[in-house]
Each structure stands twice: as C-alpha cells, then as structure tokens.
Curated annotation (Swiss-Prot):
Nucleus found in the keyword field: yes
Family matches, as Pfam families: Zn_clus
Compositional bias ranges of the Low complexity kind: 113-138, 239-250, 293-302, 309-341, 385-397, 424-444
Name of the protein: Glucose transport transcription regulator RGT1
GO molecular function per UniProt: DNA binding; DNA-binding transcription factor activity, RNA polymerase II-specific; zinc ion binding
Function: Glucose-responsive transcription factor that regulates expression of several glucose transporter (HXT) genes in response to glucose. In the absence of glucose, it functions as a transcriptional repressor, whereas high concentrations of glucose cause it to function as a transcriptional activator. In cells growing on low levels of glucose, has a neutral role, neither repressing nor activating transcription. Binds the consensus binding site sequence 5'-CGGANNA-3', of which multiple copies are present in all HXT promoters regulated by RGT1.
Post-translational modification: Glucose-induced phosphorylation regulates the DNA-binding activity. Hyperphosphorylation in cells growing on high levels of glucose does prevents DNA-binding and dephosphorylation restores DNA-binding ability.
Ranges of compositional bias, category Basic and acidic residues: 99-108, 271-280
GO cellular component, one term: nucleus
Source species of the chain: Saccharomyces cerevisiae (strain YJM789) (Baker's yeast)
UniProt keywords, alphabetically: Activator, Cytoplasm, DNA-binding, Metal-binding, Nucleus, Phosphoprotein, Repressor, Transcription, Transcription regulation, Zinc
Gene: RGT1
Amino acid sequence: MNELNTVSTNSSDSTKNGGTSNSPDDMDSAAAASHAIKKRTKASRACDQCRKKKIKCDYKDEKGVCSNCQRNGDRCSFDRVPLKRGPSKGYTRSTSHPRTNEIQDHNNSRSYNTFDNSNNTLNNNTGNSGDNGINSNTVPSTPSRSNSVLLPPLTQYIPQVGGIPPSFQNPAIQSTMPAGNIGQQQFWKVPYHEFQHQRKGSIDSLQSDISVRTLNPNEQLSYNTVQQSPITNKHTNDSGNANGSVTGSGSASGSGGYWSFIRTSGLLAPTDDHNGEQTRRSSSIPSLLRNTSNSLLLGGQPQLPPPQQQSQPQAHQQKLQQGQNPYSYSQFSQQQPYNPSISSFGQFAANGFHSRQGSVASEAMSPSAPAMFTSTSTNPVNVAQQTQRPQGQQVPQFSSELDGNKRRQSAPVSVTLSTDRLNGNENNNGEINNNNGSNNSGSSKDTSQHSQESVTTPAALEASSPGSTPQRSTKKRRKSYVSKKTKPKRDSSISITSKDSAHPMTTSSTIAYGQISDVDLIDTYYEFIHVGFPIIPLNKTTLTSDLLLVNTQPISNIHEVNSYVILWFRNSLELLVRVALKQKPGGKFFDNIVGVALSPSNDNNKAGFTTATARDDAEKTRRDSHNEVQDTLEVQSVFIAALNECFQKIVDIHPKFRENNDQISPKIKVIYLSTFILLNYILAFVGYDNSFVLGMSVTIFNEFKLYKLLLFPEPDVNDVKAPVDEEANTGNGNTKTSEFEIGSESAGHMNPSNSPNSMDENISHYSVLFKRLYVLLSVFDSLQSCAFGGPKLLNISIQGSTERFFSNDLGSKWCLEQSQLRLKSVLQSLKLGELMSELTRNRISMNGNRKPGFDITNSSSLLSEYVETQPLSVAQLFCKLLIGKHNFINCLLSLYDSEAGVYSDLTLDLSSKIADSLCSLISIILQVLTLILRLNPTNSIDFNYRPPNPPANNPTVQEGPSAMGSSPVAGNLNAAPPSEGNPDFYKKLLGLKQDTGTILSDLCRGIISPFAIAILHEVYNITELVKQMPTSLISIMMTATTTQNTQDTKKSQDLVMKLSNSMNEVVQITSVLTMIKPFKIFEHELNKPIMSLTGGLSSTTRNDVMWPKSGQGLRESSVMKTLLDERRTSGTQPTTAPVAAEESRLENVALENFVSIGWKLLDDSELGWY
C-alpha cells in the first residue's frame, strides 16, 4: 500500500509539472503497480486546451505555450488530473473501497478516509464532517457508457419509511445513509419498488415526473429540493452535523428558497470529462424538454424565500400555504412583497412533465446538453446566513438519486466563447481557493459559491455586469468508466461561467441565460424597448396578468410545448436586453452575455486580453492592437451562435404546433410568433443581414394563415375598438380564424384569477394580436429590404394598419399601451414602418411600368396628421426625411426630359425650387441627428438615463400634443433652421431648454430603436451626395444676378443666404455624425469611398461613381439610369435625339450634375442604404 501511495504521489507531481517525468524509479514503480496508475510520458501529455479540442499539442518548455493556445490568446495549463486506469481482471468491489480511499490527492493536500472509518464519521459532529461525509460515500453510480440507457435513480423506487415523500438531496448527504441499505447489491440487481398508487412512467421522465415528487398542490410554489421540507428538516441533529453544514451553506441549489425545479445539477455545469461523456451519450427515448422543463426556465434565480420556521410540522406548513394559488402560475401583482423577483416565466413549469412518451425530440434538451442557467454570483452575506440555519433540520434518508439526476440534467445552451475572457480577478480567485482548501467543506462550499443570486434590479445590472465575480475550485473530477473508486467532490459541477471551472482554460464555454430576473426583463422591455417599437403588441398589464399565465400542469397534453415556447421567448428577450445594455468603459459584449464583471481596473490583469505586453491604457490601445480584431471576430461569433440557437430552438417546435393545433392556447401562439418578431428585432438592432431568419419567419407566419386576417378583415372589423365589457358580446370571426382556435379542454382555459369567461372569450380578440404581429413582421421585412436592397417577401399592403389595429381605445384590455403619450410615440414608429413598406412595394426596380419620377404624394398624406399633432420623435422626423428625399429626387430628375433628351432651362424659379427642397432636406437631417444625440446617441439601455414617466392621463395632457402642433416652438423647429443665429439650438441639443417640444420629445429619452443604424446609414448617404449642392447653387445664383432685375436680385440674395445657412448645417451634420455610435457587435463603415458628384462645374472634374457595395467596383453611370434606359430603348426605336442631348449637356453642366445626384439618390433608395 505504501507503494501505491508512492505511485499516486508521483503521478500528482508529474501532473503539476505538466506531465513530464523521466525518473526511472517512477517508471519502475508504475510498471509494478499497473493496476493503479500508469505513468504518462511527456510525449503523450497535451495541455488542457488541446486535449479538450482533441488536437495535437506542440507544447515546449522553452516556449512556454503551444501554437494553438498562442493563436487563441490562451495559456497552456496542465491542471487536469489524468483519469485512473481501469481495474485488473481480478477487481472486486470488496477490495476497491479501502484501496481507493487510501490514495492521496496532492492537488488539494487532503487525504480521503477509508471506507472502514465511514461509520465513525457519521457520529462525528465536527466542522470537517462535511468532507468526510462526501468522501466516505460508497454508493456506486450508474456507469456512463456510450449509447447506454441510464436507469433511474434507485432512491425513487425504494419505499419511504413512515410515508415520508422522497426529496431531491445533495449527494454529499449520502454519507449519513447506512451502507447496507442499497450499497451492498449491484445496481442492476436492485429490486424494483414501484410507488404506491402511482403509474409507471418512462425511464427518462421519472426524475421530472410529478408522480415521483408527490407534491401537495399547495406546496408547488415553495417546495425546495435542497432546503428540506418542514417535515424532513426537523431531524438534522439526529444524523450529524455534516449534512447540516452541507445544506446550511446552500450546497445543491442554495438553500435560500429556490423552487423545487431548481435542481442542483441544473444550476451547475458538469465537468470536462463528465460533460464529454454526456455528449457522447444519447437517450433512447426522445424528449422535448428532458429532465425538467421547469429547471430550465429560471436558471438559478432566487425565488420564494425559505419559510421563516423551517422546523414546524408539515401540517402547519400546509395551513400557511392554503391561501396560495394552487396552480403553478401567479400574477405579478399577487407576488409576495418580500420577493419581487419571483418569475412569471418559471412558474409555468413548476410541476414538471407528466411523461416523455410521444414528445418531440430536441437535441438541446437531451441529457447531453450542458446546463444553460448557470450560477454566476455569490452573495457572501447570504451564504453566511444560510450557514447559520436552524439546527432543526433532518438529514435526508436517501440522496443518491441526485447523481443520476445530474447525469440526465438538461439545459439548452450551446454558445461558445473563450473561457479566458470569462476569468475574473485572479488574485481573488487564489484567496477563494485557499479558503476552500482550509474549510475543506466539499459539496457545501462550491454550490453556495456558484449558486446564482439573481439581479433583481436593473440598477444592479448597470452597477456591475449581471452577476458578481464568479469563483472556481482547482479540484477536477476524476471518474472511471467502470466504477466510482472515490466519491468525487461537488467541484465537478462548477458553474460554467466560473473562473477556470469545469472547462479549464479551454476555448469554449457556454452563455448562461437566466441571469436577469423575469420581472426585470419585463420591466426593462416596457421601459426601454416597447415605446421605440412594440415587439410584444400588448400592454404590460394584460401581458403579465393574462397572456403569460399559461398552465403547464400535467392535465394538459401540450404542457411541454407551453414551457418550451415560454423558455425560448424568455431567452430571446434576455439576449436582446444583454446586447442592448450599455457597456462600461473597457467592457465587452461578454459582460452582458455571461455576466462577468469587467472593469478597467482589473482588465489588464486577465489572461486572454493581452498576449505579450500589458496594456497601459486598455481603452485606447485596444482599438489599435491586433487583439481587438480577434476580440471583434470572437464577439461576433458568440452573438451569431446565440441568435442562431434561439432561432433554431423556436423553429424546431413548429411541427408540434401543427400536430396539436386545436389544443394549443392562442396565448402560446402569440408568444410563439412574438419570438420571431423578437429575433428579427435583434437583427435590425445590430444591423446584421440574415435573410434566413426573416425568410423562415415569413414561412411560419404563412403556415398560420395570418395573411387571411388582413385580406379578409370584415368579420371582425370592430375587434380593435371593443372594450373589456363587450368581450362576451362579440361572437363573430370564428370562421376566418379557425387556425387559432383552442380546444375546449386546453390548459389555457384554466385561470381562476380572472373572470370565468376571461379565457373563454371569443377568439376574435386574439385575432387583433395576430394582425398586429403580421404587421410587425411586414415592417421588419420592409426595413431589411430598404437597408440591404433585397426584394420584399410580404407584399400585402399594410397601409392604414396603424389606425386600424394599434390605435385602439385605451379602455380595452387589448390596447397597445396604457399611456396616451407613450402610445403616440409607439404609433410614430409604426407609421415609419408603414411608410417604408409602401416605398419598398412601389420600387421602380420591382415595377417595370413605372417612370423614374414617380409621385409619392399619397404616402405623404399618410403622415400629414401625425407630423402636425404628435410630439417630436426620431421616427417622425425620419418619415419627413424619406418623403423629402423622394420629392427631391422627383425635382432633380424632372430637370431632364428623357423623351426629348434635353435639359430644362435653369431659371430663377427653378433654382428657387431646387434650393428650397435642398435646404429643407438638410435641415431635417440636422434635426434627426441632434434629436438622436440628445435622446440616445448609443442606442443602448442605460439605467442611469431612464425615460421619464409620462404624466397621468388628464385633459391637460390630452391637449398637449395638439397644442404642440400650433405652438411657435414646433413651428420654429420645423421652419427655422437651428443655425440661423438661434442661440436656443445648443440648449435644445443639451436638453437645457425645457419647452413643450423638448418635454414631449423627452418621452423617448433612453429608448432604443431597431431603426437607429438604418437611419444613420441613410442620413450619411444623403449628406454625402448633397453636401456640395449648396455651393454649386450659390455659384449659379451669383452668376445669374448680373442679368436680372432688382426684384429678381433680391430674391437671389435671399436664396444665397438660405444656401449659406445650409452649408453651415452641413458642417454641423458632419460633426454630429462622429458623435453618434449606435453600432452593436458589428462595425458599420459609414465613410464609404463615395466621391461627390458636384466636385466641379466641368465635365472633366465631375465623377459619376456608383456605390461600391454593388460588388462590381466603380462605374460611370447610375444603375437605375442604365436599367431604365435599357427598358426604354427595348420598347422604342432609337432616334437622333442624342445629338441634341450632347449639345444641351455641354451647355448645362450644372443641370447634368444635379440630375446625376438625383439618379444616385434613386440608386440609394433602390439598392439599399447599407
């Protein structure tokens, strides 16, 4: 045995030295003890990163890093303990425990107690009993072989003594269990004991089956897996202090009041080897949401706090809970006052799945999927409070099933990023590890460190990244494919976002959702996102009190679908919020994704951000370093992977929708379709071109036949204006919307909190939401068509849809926004989308019979009412800009007669017309930019720059918007340019002048918009094309004044003064453009190499340049001009007009330049803004 210890010691030493050992004594010793550990030479020892990716490692001592780690900015580490070799043929279980427990682990300088001393440990109530209980456990777990079906945990089938229901406990608590209970038999020969009065479920569904839990309906909101129920907590001292210490520190899921579906393995990620084994393993019974759909929804967020008296009897506990909602959902307004972060999303899955048979298979929900909702923060105060829990707690009788649960733990996540970038403060990490080693508390330390404390306030999200500094442990899991020789520490389930956690220094880790509480997600959405563009076309009250209250109890056949849809809707919303969160100086996209607190103070000390030299100024040098390029590419890949995952998961459930179309509630359908709107919003928000997401979204919407609701709206034309008290009286519209009807036995009908007929109301009311969703998707289709120049996929006209479907009565339950002023801002964004839809539907390139100078006066009339009566907003001004641009195009193209081939005479009246259109266009551009700069120049969510609360609805406020239209402020803002010697311009820019227009426009302060990047691109394109026109027109005016009379001369001087002001505005526009940075993830280059078309008045200095984004380089003519010329010449015979046109061209160079600008502006509208 001394020889065995010597071999183990040498192996540990060689591991610490990178696996290098040339000692003959070591080789002889390994040969003599081949049954224990075989020495590995340096040639077969790869660093942890290369081993994880299974690539060749060329590590050398003189270099200190392999080529792979050097390329990825990582460091080579050899922290992983090699796996033990398999036992010899004569291996028996009776001899395995003493031999195994005597092998010393030199990584943590601890020794494992032998199996013979485990009984003495049970009676020892010292502080170190927790570790002894962990290491003395001899219950073997199910071996994980490839393509094997895991048996369910044994403890689920062993009858409970005294009728005590089984509870899901920490594996560390198994030390108190008598060794002769279940450890004496081989696991495959243990007799099967079925629960009494319960059906037999499938193998893969037992751990998430509600029949296994045997929960009282009144306990469904407060039952805790690790925090024992009152009936089991009263016997803690009877079994020893070890388990009291374990549960006291919140080892499994944190005993701070987590719900029953927050399992230990749900909050923690498996280790390197364990996760790899799970990846290789597949289940024979597919499942939509394997293990627990409920454990996926909250992801370690703190929920209901533990009862105040945990030692009270169960009967008394049930009396306290009789007043609670017996269902697994509750309204936001019904939450307990001391628990503001209770999740309305996670409540939908509080009861688990009834069965897995016949469900849809999902790879992300398979047992091989890593945990998604991870723990990233630890509150030392809470840990201390948890450690001081009352002693009246019972050590659970059986707890070995958690090891089996951990093997089948499911949580969907597959977004990778560099773990080096997830590392926190290394100095603090060392202290944490030292404390862990001294406490030697095994399972009780790591989960309490890694159990997530949800960020319950948006201010906390801004103060530090979502989640505090994570912690790690250096102990890695060692397991054998044959048997468990030693009970591994719970460090094997370290959080996937912790420092150097279960994936040590590898290049892949997982994005953790669930770091923002669900209440904060909803509040953040309605505060910062909804006013800019309504992704969820419903007010907050109805959403939280009706739409999200979906029953997921097993009485429904489609509860899996409900939980699955709500889960990925929540994940998509959190992805948007994290992308939109304002980054702190020195921060990165990883801050908002994984919640690692990065700051300039410790940014220079983390590996992965520098390779050779430390940066003195991280904020400045990062932009010029090569690491910045790598960081940008990595951030983009992480974002794309996260977006694609959310999109793929929500698409995978569509076949299930078609199978259960009549049973699925319209609530779930609204949430499901809103998820597609949400994903398209994210694409538009970051300015990323992904036509596949939009195309599949259109396909899904067409599968639901939503277009029929817009094409044939006559049966339910009065749905929009229907108030709440008339819901029961509207009985029409069923024939046209049969696609969205729900069965009479659907779970969606269960809602005792509302009126009896609240869920049985006519489906026509939900059809209003479906119409809105279709209009929103058409808006994103139009936006992508305008931005990237692609064809529009939805050709149904949405003209007038804003008034018909969105501007409904505020008293209606289905209203879009309850605040009148905020509703007007929302409608302006929708009107912008409506205008873009009409512009894309009437493109010249898509309509061969149209002439180049088409009239859009009808589109202008659409916005006449809103332009005059609404508070100033970016969407409203951009609508004016698009209309002014098309009017300006018509004005410029009318200077050339394409039929006769001659230019018009440049008279004073024509020059005045061109100058007025040009000055108006430039003035609107400046107003757009200054308003963006004042409201939200970075288009980010900043909790320190919140939107103001709108005043209460009263007659004074109702008259506010109307009064603004006739106020001199609005008139001055539209008519008088800010540069006309107006000193109030800079006050308005800085928000110092609090007049009516400023106050009303401040309602959009801090609001994010999906149009921000597209608006900036279009503004820049127009500015680059027209910025030289004022100079050219002034030259023409000055030349023409010599031949004009006195009256014309005065008019020319006024035009020159007006054009001079426009030149000053162009300078301001150029300056403001550099101050607006709405870009996220992807960098957009605004200063494209576009040369001015009016560089001079001679044909030799003029440059006709096409956008380089066409991919064909520079050309001398406009794309649209060439296209229309070909159409015209193909339909008519060639004439001799080009000769006359040539003469006219030589005489009217300025006119030709203006016409060329008109063609280029038309190219911009037809080919895309980006």
